[in-house]
Regions:
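Accessory beta-strand-rich segments of carbohydrate-active enzymes
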Residues: 43-57, 80-81, 95-99, 105, ...
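Exposed aromatic-hydrophobic patches
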Residues: 211-217, 320-329
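Residue-level detector of high-confidence beta-strand sites
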Residues: 99, 124, 203, 311-313
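Bacterial Sec-dependent N-terminal signal peptides
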Residues: 1-43
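Surface beta-strand/loop "capping" patches
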Residues: 262-292
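Metallo-beta-lactamase
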Residues: 332-338
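Accessory carbohydrate-binding/adhesion or oligomerization-edge regions at the termini
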Residues: 41-144, 226-234
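Beta-strand-rich binding/interaction modules
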Residues: 196, 280-315, 321-323
Length: 338
């Protein structure tokens, strides 16, 4: 390994720059790509998705490396997405309804004209049990429902299956019109159902893994919009969580919207290596891009002081680009100088 604080990628197109910043630890995102993902349609399943092992994601984006697409190299180097005009947080108070049993959840709550005036305010991120909704359970071995019903995978009871329904109105910046707009949810346990402006968007049940949805066709920039979510305490995936931890329900990590140009870098995979008897270094970079065939992608590697130490350029073909960046005698990683 060798040292290098950040790599800047610039997708050159006539309309806008798409500068993507990522640290080398983004390679850990490959763990997400190894997950088995089901894409069965709801109409093809007799059981609801939350009891169907063949379905754990519906209409979600493919898991990717963790990075944010800034509008300038200067913002990318600061790495504070909150300062980007392409970022909009959804954190804070949402209108919230909690029921102990899933079958008591409000029907049609995602409709734009649904009356939620009697709902309470609840923080996002926030966990049900921490805020007084349901019992806090710590379990070392065995399932949290062991005293309530017998295990029969993949089936889960609706009784004591806490369910939280969320609603939030907000306005999208008018200058996001024409861009792609995505929603990022850092963690939803045990599952997440999503609607926008009364229309179903998607489903996910990978509790601790982040998930993203494409909201472009559902949102109206410059106008008031409604997002509705529903989270359940247990689903069929909960059978895989017989571990030593607190059994909490809700959204535990950041939630936000972000915008990108139509032509964009959608994923990056970087493999660092040492060559020439461990003296020199190289980065093998694989880029996935959308609506960018024939366009150039420029790479710029900077050290921890902000000095450019290497550059490269390649052209997208078939939505892909592979590029090698070579470095002469870079700083090496050690336990003393990580």
């Amino acid at each position: 390994m060798f040292l290098g604080d950040f790599l800047l990628l610039n997708l050159n197109n006539a309309n806008s720059l798409n500068d993507n910043w990522m640290k080398r630890n983004m390679l850990m995102a490959a763990l997400f790509l190894a997950a088995t993902v089901g894409f069965a349609a709801k109409t093809e399943s007799k059981a609801p998705w939350w009891m169907d092992p063949s379905v754990n994601r519906v209409n979600t984006l493919t898991p990717r490396a963790s990075f944010f697409a800034y509008e300038s190299a200067e913002l990318a180097q600061k790495n504070q997405k909150e300062s980007s005009s392409r970022f909009m947080t959804l954190e804070g108070d949402w209108n919230f309804n909690w029921v102990k049993d899933h079958d008591k959840a409000p029907a049609g709550f995602y409709a734009v004209d649904y009356d939620d005036s009697k709902w309470v305010k609840f923080p996002v991120p926030g966990l049900f049990e921490i805020h007084g909704y349901g019992d806090r359970i710590y379990k070392n071995v065995g399932y949290a429902w062991a005293t309530q019903f017998s295990s029969n995978p993949p089936y889960i009871e609706e009784k004591n299956n806490y369910t939280g329904s969320y609603r939030k109105e907000f306005e999208i910046p008018a200058d996001w019109k024409g861009d792609n707009i995505y929603m990022h949810v850092g963690s939803a346990t045990s599952n997440l159902m999503l609607w926008v402006n009364g229309k179903f968007v998607g489903y996910s049940e990978d509790s601790k893994a982040e998930v993203e949805f494409d909201l472009t066709k559902f949102l109206q920039p410059g106008k008031k919009n409604l997002i509705a979510m529903q989270v359940m305490r247990w689903c069929d995936g909960s059978y895989l969580e017989d571990q030593d931890f607190w059994r909490f329900t809700g959204i535990a990590r950041e939630v936000y919207l972000y915008a990108t140009p139509k032509a964009r870098v959608s994923d990056v995979y970087i493999t660092p290596d040492l060559v020439n008897n461990y003296r020199d270094g190289k980065l093998d970079v694989k880029v996935s891009a959308e609506n960018a065939n024939g366009q150039k992608v420029s790479f710029e590697l900077k050290d921890q002081t902000g000095k450019t130490v290497a550059t490269a350029e390649g052209k997208v073909a078939g939505g892909k680009l592979a590029q090698t960046i070579e470095l002469s005698n870079p700083q090496k990683w050690t336990a003393e100088t990580p």
